[in-house]
Each structure stands twice: as structure tokens, then as C-alpha cells.
Amino acid sequence: MEEHGTVKGRRRHIFVWKALRPLARLICWIKFGFTSEVSRVRGPFLLVSNHVTNWDPILVACSFPEQAYFVTSEHLLRAGLGGKLVGWLQSPIPRQKSGSAATTVLTMMRYLRRGLNVCVFPEGNRTWDGVTAEFLPSIAKLARTSGAALVTYKLTGGYFASPRWAGNSIRRGKMHGATVRVYSPEELRAMSPQEINERIVSDLHEDAYERQRKNPVRFEGKALAEHMERLLFLCPRCGRMHTLQSRDDTVRCWKCGFSFRYLPTGFLSGEDIPFDNLRDWTRWQKGEIVRLCDEADDKPIFTDTDVRVDTVVSGSGTKLLGRGDMRLFRDRLELPGASLPAGDITGVSLMGPQDLYISAGDTHYVVRSGTVHCMVKYLTALSHLNGGVHYGE
């Protein structure tokens, strides 16, 4: 996408950014109740932000009059006409899901050294529990050596406005976006990569439930709890897997009758419920996943039915590998059409609420299903079974 030392279509990208930004601010306020503080920072700059909704690139852009190139999943750019349109309008920097980030980092470096602005969400994926996730320290090294300014930016309220497990469901409340700090190139050169990383971690840290307890905000919408099974798959009362079912604002275990409601504030309400929020429930569930992995013998740890597996063919989409059931064992992951030794899996991540991307060396797989599944459990399990796997939620 590069030509003559810059980016092909550069003038078009700037025009589209400036022309659509005022409209984007209006639409984001109508849909989310989103407000933002306009930044007057001059480029080139590396912009880093926490990641909470699918709308984050548009939300972040509302604060910056200067155009920036976003790092985005290669999968989005392969998504039919919409992906081609996004590529033509703004030419994002592609990032392979569950693959190595080295090529992406080099492209970002070239852009920054040519005086262009780059925006990246270093977590790589949206939060599941409302807490900013860990990320690779390579972003700090890039910031220090690029010669550009570093801008840290935080979005708040997005976790409840658009929960990842809820798919495209949007609940209107209050969202806000603002620059946290601007670090000059001189400041960055005076710091070590570790110090820069610590600053980024501190600036981007957000705990949605902690903020919500202090200043409760209602996020109104329909069917508030539907598809929560994409996140929760263990009943805390009977301990059975895949027995929780959601409908409207209620989740119920069809085995033991345990039930709770998801409130407009994002908290949970129910008789004898052990957790009043999804952050604590998710932490408990991760511990249970580790226990299940450690206690498993030669039987499957998890089984999910009715899945479709494709291999990712770079530049031309995907190719069907098989349909059927997937099973995770301590030593392998069995997919329709392939059996992957756990030690050969080098990367695992999720796109959206439940599309599972798996890398085994240079081969990339994507697991999809028209049925609601909790696929995030595989990330926790595989990262425990294989400590060398690149893990992204």
C-alpha cells in the first residue's frame, strides 16, 4: 500500500478523515452517549488506547483532527465488500490474528519515521471482564525508537455499552474518551523500554466494575443478558459445563435451576449468587479451567459441537477444512479435519465474541459456529497447557 515514500491514497485518507469525523462524533453520541476531548497534539505520533468495543477506531478518531493509520486484524480487511471499502477509505495496517506481530511492528516503524501517525490497541483484543488486559512489551520499544511522540488515550464506559459476549448489541449510557498523556520523543529517549511500558500500562488501565461501583451509570437496551453463554460456561452451583442459558435479562442453569439477572448497571442479581459482577465470575472460571486441565486424564477437557473449521489462506480468504465436533485433550486439540498436538500450537486468539483463531507454525485455522459457544475457555486452557503459546483474547 506504500508508494513514493508515503502511503498510496494518502490524500484520500486525509480527506475522508476530516470529512467524516464531525459526522462520526454525532453518530457516536447518539448510539453510545459518547463524549470526547479533542487533542491538539501534532504528529508524527504513536497513539495507544485500551480496547472495549468494535467502534473503538471511530471513537478514538473523534478526538484527533490529524489523520492516523490504525492497526487492524487482517481478517477484517478480508471481510468482503466492507473490508475492501475500509481498506480503500483508510488503508489500515494489517495484523495476522494469532500470528507473529513482527511484520506489523516493522510497518508501524516505517510509517512513523515517514512522519505519519499510527494508532494501535496494544491489548490486541477487546476486554472480556472490563479490565485492561496485558500486552506485549514490543510497543514500548517501538515508541522509544520511532522518533515520534507517544500519546496514551483511554476509553471509559464502553464495556457496559457494548459487552463483547453480546455481539452487536449496544446499550446507551455514558461513554467518554480522552488523552491521558503525551510523551515527547525526548522524554521517551530518556526512559528505558521497561519504564515506557510501565507508563503505558498505568495510563491505559481501566477496571469498569471498579468505576461503576463508585459512579453507577445505567446502560439501557434490550435483551441485556442474551448470549452471555459466550463468556460463562460453568454453573457455580452445580459445577456442570454448558448448562447456562440466557433469555432477555436472565441466565438460568437448566440442570439445577440456578438463575440470575443482568442489570442495566452491568451488575448481577440473584438468590445465593456467588458473584455480583462478571469480572469476579470470570476470574473464578479461569481458575476452574486450570483445575479441569490439571485433573484431566485421557478424556476430553472440553467438547463443542457443530463447528466449522477453515484454514486461512493469506491474501485470498479461507478454505473449508471440515465440519463437526472439536475436543480439547491435555496433549492435543482435535478439530474436524485436523489434530493439533498442544505443543505445536503457537498462537490462539478470538475475533469478535466466538471466532477462534489457532496458529500451528505457518498454518492458521479459524473455528466458527452458528451455535452460541464459549470459545474463550480454549484460550485459557491452551495457554495453561502450552506456556509458549501466543495468547490473545
PLM-predicted stretches and their roles:
Residues E3, V7-W17, R21, L26-E198, ...:
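Soluble catalytic domains of membrane acyltransferases
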Residues L47, D325-L356:
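Phosphoinositide-dependent membrane-docking surfaces
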Residues Y153-L155, T243-Q245, F260, G324-R330, ...:
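Broad, structure-driven detector of short, well-ordered beta-strand segments within folded domains
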Residues S192-A208, M375-G388:
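Short amphipathic C-terminal alpha-helix that caps PH/PH-like domains
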Residues E210-G221, Y391-E393:
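Short, flexible loop/turn segments with low-complexity composition
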Residues E220-I273:
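Cys/His-rich short segments
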Residues R261-A338:
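Long, charge-rich boundary regions
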Residues G343-E393:
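Acidic, Ser/Thr- and proline-rich intrinsically disordered linker/docking segments
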